[in-house]
């Protein structure tokens, strides 16, 4: 049965935001981390969504907010233990996404062996572009992502540099978390992550596909 929910408004009804960390070797190196044999996963709540036109809110407890530009994959149907060979059949489209990160908080969490929830899952920590139908991106592993802050290029990278491919990620995640229509998977960020502050303007894009702008504001809480 076809869904009556519009994927063009996925941020209004999608349930899960599953994020993949350490999926670009150059970013792993800049973070002084280690490439692992399996994807690093963490979650964001649906209240993390910030569609274009809304601000990126810097939590009151954060003093070092970082940008991470990523390709997001939108699921078009329910999937459980999806075979890697069939994984792309579950993709409805894509979105450009930011994984906003309270880096100072994340560093403390790492030192204490704690989850990254406070650093990664706050309100508006997942700004997203308009929905891009699957047909507009024939090869999601042949894209150039970029991000600017106040007009200065900070991040750029090619999705061909992913350590784990999109089909592998979908299959891997679906064996742990049952995926639903409208769920979003963030596929990792290339090198160049860095700090933003209140009143900064973030602009990001996928060459020839989509772009978006957000302004950073300080949250009251």
Swiss-Prot record:
Recorded GO MF terms: acetylpyruvate hydrolase activity; acylpyruvate hydrolase activity; fumarylpyruvate hydrolase activity; metal ion binding; oxaloacetate decarboxylase activity; oxaloacetate tautomerase activity
Phosphoserine PTM positions: 37
Modified residues (N6-succinyllysine): 112
Transit peptide, UniProt annotation: 1-24
Principal cellular location given in the protein's record: mitochondrion
Domain of life: Eukaryota
Family: Belongs to the FAH family.
Source species: Rattus norvegicus (Rat)
Annotated positions of the N6-acetyllysine modification: 110
EC number: 5.3.2.2, 3.7.1.5, 4.1.1.112
Subunit-level organization: Homodimer.
Name recorded for this polypeptide: Oxaloacetate tautomerase FAHD1, mitochondrial
